[in-house]
Regions:
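Glycine-rich nucleophile elbow surrounding the catalytic serine of serine-hydrolase chemistry
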Residues: 180-192
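Beta-strand-enriched, solvent-exposed domains that form extended recognition/catalytic surfaces
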Residues: 1-77
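Patatin-like phospholipase
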Residues: 110, 121-123, 128-130, 134-149, ...
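The feature captures the conserved acid-bearing segment of alpha/beta-hydrolase catalytic domains
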Residues: 220-295, 301-326
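Alpha/beta-hydrolase active-site loop
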Residues: 149-171
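Hydrolase active-site cap/lid region
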Residues: 194-234
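Alpha/beta-hydrolase fold nucleophile elbow
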Residues: 170-182
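Short, surface-exposed "cap/lid" segments of acyl-processing enzymes
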Residues: 82-133, 137-142, 266
Length: 329
């Protein structure tokens, strides 16, 4: 809420049975002064219901609305799923979700960032559970399909969460593996480089968020317009110069990272209609040229044309688990 002088502002929730109007008197006022999730006191019924939420405000000025999330309650034992957690920016109330599986408590710690998702949830849970090593899964529920895990406070919270679990497990950065597919490659590469992880494994990398927006009209018409909402969170204007500055800033920061002890595994689409520069920029980056290892494979087609690019990702993960950490299977 910005520049809004109000005598009253609140959220009111009330429910009604399917096919009925319900009773507006039976409503619940939601506390807008907290970033904590709030439980609606609803009892189980055999028939379906609709929950309606209305914003009540009185005053003059500008009102800014964000996403409203409706989830099953876990009764104090987690968010999203049992054991899940929320990392919340206290100023904007934006959040990302995280789930930690301690596995067998032996190295490494696998960190995975979910790709673009309309439904809230964690990707790759079965895959990393089958590895048996500790894993930390992230999901970004912001905007329509996620926001590439960007934002100064969100970035800080994500890295703090990773380092906290490394410390609790008694691991070092040499026992940290960062993973991501598509939208998840941006944070895997960015935070993996900043933390000097042992390895970074990504499939279908997207690193140039400004460039993705610039080529949308000709290369990807009427698809993924959400990129303009995402970029507007990173820059005040969406001019060509401002969009180019987003990517320039990413690569300037990336180049300053120390990758001398980091292995990189990159699977990319040769005709990617989102970011066809990511592999080129990575392979020519000064920090990557000093990396301990840089392995890559290109697949013909656009971003979502060939599922083999994901199979290659899984194969490299299992190969790394066996060769570097003695894990078989």
């Amino acid at each position: 809420m910005s520049n809004f002088f109000v005598a009253l502002h609140r959220l009111r929730a009330f429910y009604s049975p399917l096919g009925g109007d319900g009773d507006p008197a039976k409503s619940f006022i939601l506390d807008m002064d907290t970033s904590d999730e709030q439980d609606l006191p609803l009892k189980p019924l055999e028939v379906g219901r609709l929950t309606n939420v209305q914003l009540e405000a009185r005053g003059q000025g500008v009102l800014i609305l964000g996403n409203l999330h409706l989830r099953w309650s876990r009764r104090g034992v987690g968010h999203y799923i049992v054991g899940g957690d929320r990392l919340v920016d206290p100023q904007t109330r934006e959040e990302v979700g995280v789930y930690f599986n301690p596995g067998d408590l032996k190295p490494p710690l696998n960190v995975y960032f979910s790709g673009a998702r309309e439904l809230e949830g964690f990707e790759a849970y079965p895959l990393f559970r089958s590895v048996h090593a500790p894993s930390l899964l992230f999901t970004d529920p912001r905007l329509e399909v996620g926001q590439f895990y960007t934002g100064a406070k969100i970035s800080e919270l994500i890295k703090e969460k990773i380092m906290t679990h490394l410390k609790e497990l008694g691991f070092t950065k040499d026992q940290l593996v960062m993973n991501g597919i598509s939208m998840g490659t941006y944070p895997a590469l960015k935070y993996g480089a900043e933390l000097s992880a042992h390895a970074i494994i990504v499939s279908k990398p997207i690193t140039n968020l400004g460039y993705v927006a610039l080529r949308g009209r000709l290369h990807r018409p009427d698809e993924f317009d959400t990129i303009f909402d995402i970029d507007s969170q990173l820059t005040k204007k969406l001019s060509i110069a401002d969009l180019n500055m987003i990517d320039q800033t990413f690569w300037e920061d990336f180049t300053e990272c120390d990758l001398t002890n980091t292995k990189l595994f990159i699977a990319y689409m040769k005709d990617d209609d989102y970011d066809n520069l990511a592999y080129h920029d990575l392979s020519n980056n000064r920090a990557v040229k000093k990396a301990r290892q840089f392995i890559y494979k290109g697949f013909p087609g656009r971003h979502n044309d060939d599922p083999e690019v994901v199979s290659w990702f899984v194969s490299r993960l299992k190969e790394l688990m066996q060769n570097d950490f003695g894990r078989k299977g």
